[in-house]
Amino acid sequence: MVLMILPIIGSVSASEGLVAMVTLCLVYMIMKYMHTEIPEGLKRLPGPKPLPIIGNMLEVHNNPHLSLTAMSERYGSVFQIQIGMRPVVVLSGNETVRQALIKQGEDFAGRSDLYSFKFINDGKSLAFSTDKAGVWRARRKLAMSALRSFATLEGTTPEYSCALEEHVLKEGEYLVKQLTSVMDVSGSFDPFRHIVVSVANVICGMCFGRRYSHDDQELLGLVNMSDEFGQVVGSGNPADFIPILRYLPNRTMKRFMDINDRFNNFVQKIVSEHYESYDKDNIRDITDSLIDHCEDRKLDENANIQVSDEKIVGIVNDLFGAGFDTISTALSWAVVYLVAYPETQERLHQELKEKVGMIRTPRLSDKINLPLLEAFILEIFRHSSFLPFTIPHCTIKDTSLNGYFIPKDTCVFINQWQVNHDPELWKEPSSFNPDRFLSADGTELNKLEGEKVLVFGMGKRRCIGEAIGRNEVYLFLAILLQRLRFQEKPGHPLDMTPEYGLTMKHKRCQLKASMRPWGQEE
């Protein structure tokens, strides 16, 4: 982000008019800050002193989760920085984050009015929108209802317990065949390249009721758009924090808007096709479920806010995003960790062999009997912390936290990485150790420890895709562990240094996989 903004600042200084406007804005911000009245009994937020115009951007380097963690060690779990001309409160520490998002959840339930957010789903995004509480709550309730219908375990059947299980099991089988086929031809494979396509197929099946071949150009186009979106968002948009830059040519922002337009048009086309073929007695997927809601003209029972047909596109767009990049990143990290810790990989396979066997495919109903696998997934979430921050929150009224005054409309960052690596919360936090989530005898999952891991956010803005995420990662991973053994490619050592972006991904690598004796007991 810093590297992007410095050349822009140079171009701004070349124009006297723009310099004057920036100066006026700066003077206004300083005067506003200096005249912010602190209620009696409360304290002013601590934090580093900002520089003119750019604030503390030079101190927030290319790995902001690390630099902000270092600042929290100096200033505490609640402190303020200035990014450009926007004050930002940074929250760290498990207790502080829980206090803000759960106990004082209403105060911190807003979304910051960042400029770029207006272009995500044409400003109708459930996750990014600054809509009033009644509006986003009504749409969130609708989205959660659709997800529960298709993505959660509501009792087993001879076939599949839910649509998610059906889609993942079929796609998992195909992924195993793909990896073994690639191994036969090339002798190694790129885990992210194949996993991301499989995960995209699952969410397409859930949302759109269609499955693509892995070389389908429409599917690959979706995958590429998601990758572009992550790159652009991860690089940051200076106009979010220096308002005057909105009026200057911005190649990155133009690319960001183009990606959103392309994906919105794709989803709009799918939704229109669903309207044409909609059958109330045959709800095929999540899009049909949302249309069914709008056809029945159901109202939010609290706010009486009707969800219009146009909002369906935004909700489907959000659900696709919630069920795609996060899950593919988690699964790709999981395979890399299996290679990095081969003894853990063998323990996981042994657990599956004993509890599920080598004849049938693992199911969602097996999850309760696979505590080590669940612990492994939790430790991947914690150790990699591939979602280092939540989407920025915003205070909806003047409030206080830990004795510090926080004004209304303040942008709030939640440092999930710090919580997941806090030495006060975890023993040897830098060590990868799934056993930290197991009981002393290793037979049960310690759910209280698992609840400390922060990956999907918490409180009123908790990720709506969490149910999909946890179950999908579990099912895919169980199938892969049961069928395949993963190894490092000789001469290609793993580099697990994360690359910062919307989600932190591992460096692309080449791995090896070999079939286990599937279909017969070892």
UniProtKB/Swiss-Prot annotation:
Substrate binds at F229. It is found in: Endoplasmic reticulum membrane; Microsome membrane. It is an enzyme of class 1 (oxidoreductase). Gene3D superfamilies: Cytochrome P450. Keywords: Endoplasmic reticulum, Heme, Iron, Membrane, Metal-binding, Microsome, Monooxygenase, Oxidoreductase. It is a peripheral membrane protein. It catalyses: an organic molecule + reduced [NADPH--hemoprotein reductase] + O2 = an alcohol + oxidized [NADPH--hemoprotein reductase] + H2O + H(+). It comes from the Eukaryota. Induction: By 3-methylcholanthrene (3MC). Its main location: endoplasmic reticulum. One of its GO terms (cellular component) is heterochromatin. Its EC number is 1.14.14.1. Coiled coil: none annotated. Heme binds at C463. GO terms for molecular function: catalytic activity; heme binding; iron ion binding; steroid 17-alpha-monooxygenase activity. Liver. Its cofactor is heme. GO terms for biological process: hormone biosynthetic process; progesterone metabolic process; response to polycyclic arene. InterPro entries: Cyt_P450, Cyt_P450_CS, Cyt_P450_E_grp-I, Cyt_P450_E_grp-I_CYP1, Cyt_P450_sf. Belongs to the cytochrome P450 family. Cytochromes P450 are a group of heme-thiolate monooxygenases. They oxidize a variety of structurally unrelated compounds, including steroids, fatty acids, and xenobiotics. PANTHER family: CYTOCHROME P450 1A (PTHR24289:SF21), STEROID 17-ALPHA-HYDROXYLASE/17,20 LYASE (PTHR24289). This is Cytochrome P450 1A3. The lineage of its organism: Eukaryota, Metazoa, Chordata, Craniata, Vertebrata. The gene is cyp1a3.
